Amino acid sequence: MILLEVNNRIIEEILTLKFENAAAGNKPEAVEVTFADFDGVLYHVSNPNGDKAKVLISISLKFYKELQEHGTDEVLKKVYGNFLVAPESGYNVSLLYDLESLPSNKDSVIHQAGMLKRNCFASVFEKYFKFQEEGKDGEKRAVIHYRDDETMYVEAKKDRVTVVFSTVFKDDDDVVIGKVFMQEFKEGRRASHTAPQVLFSHREPPLELKDTDAAVGDNIGYITFVLFPRHTNANARDNTINLIHTFRDYLHYHIKCSKAYIHTRMRAKTSDFLKVLNRARPDAEKKEMKTITGKTFAAR
């Protein structure tokens, strides 16, 4: 299986190029790039007020207000410090980099810029991991509508943190492949006792969402992760956040890859069958044609 990159490579490549050119004393060039990421996220990289010596990176998330309720602003201030500036119009978060004053830890700065989307998500998980660590129970469940018709729920207990993703399958085939895919996670837990418990429910929400307005339908699926202290402690939580916040994209990416692989195999088999049929086809019987004098026509 393929793990999707947590960081945004486009941002990292742009900043790396800008920092290297600035360090070499080259004349700065203009940049104006707008691009999308998973979950409807939009990025904009530009020169503020046309100043080529400065690079502004902005991100737009439709669900940012819900993240703010769980301390995203504070987490971003902690991670980005002075690079964090007032957000550009139409965006939620902006980072400003001055090419005339390069940081000493350029590699770390570039990496964190590429992790902007992940760091926006992180506050929700960090908050509930801390609730579990402190033994708090009964805290209000976090509800993040990370896509127009899909939702993430996070809830903390004294001994665990439960994360539930709702997802919509566009085709009936996706449901079948999704079920097979999720079965692999169950098999994986048998092989590794340190893996989190993963549950999948189709049509109906899990018991954790019993009294909520969680969607119900033939094309709705719910993936539940049960995270224990070994997954949420200070040493493991960063990696847990990296993996779990991209899980929905990871699932649908592999569903599409599986369908593409099946279609490729089907086309290859069809081609093989056609070759067999062509070899088995009997040759057409040649009809001998003669003239009135009895001579035979010969093809030239």
Swiss-Prot record:
> Which is a Gene Ontology cellular component entry for this protein?
cytoplasm
InterPro entries attached to this UniProt entry: ARPC2, ARPC2/4
Query: Where found in the cell?
Result: Cytoplasm, Cytoskeleton; Cell projection; Nucleus
Q: Name one GO biological process term.
A: actin filament polymerization
What does the UniProt keyword field contain?
Actin-binding, Cell projection, Cytoplasm, Cytoskeleton, Nucleus
Asked if the Swiss-Prot or TrEMBL record annotates the protein with the keyword Cytoplasm, the reply is: yes
Instruction: Note the Gene3D superfamilies from the entry.
Output: 3.30.1460.20
Q: Which domain of life is it from?
A: Eukaryota
Signal among the record's keywords? no
> One GO molecular function term?
actin filament binding
For this protein, the record's PANTHER family field holds: ACTIN-RELATED PROTEIN 2_3 COMPLEX SUBUNIT 2, ARP2/3 COMPLEX 34 KDA SUBUNIT
Subunit info here reads: Component of the Arp2/3 complex composed of actr2/arp2, actr3/arp3, arpc1 (arpc1a or arpc1b), arpc2, arpc3, arpc4 and arpc5.
The free-text function statement in the UniProt record for this protein reads:
Actin-binding component of the Arp2/3 complex, a multiprotein complex that mediates actin polymerization upon stimulation by nucleation-promoting factor (NPF). The Arp2/3 complex mediates the formation of branched actin networks in the cytoplasm, providing the force for cell motility. In addition to its role in the cytoplasmic cytoskeleton, the Arp2/3 complex also promotes actin polymerization in the nucleus, thereby regulating gene transcription and repair of damaged DNA.
What family does this chain come from, according to its entry?
A: Belongs to the ARPC2 family.
Quote the protein name from its UniProt record: Actin-related protein 2/3 complex subunit 2-A
Q: Which organism is it from?
A: Xenopus laevis
- The coding gene here is arpc2-a
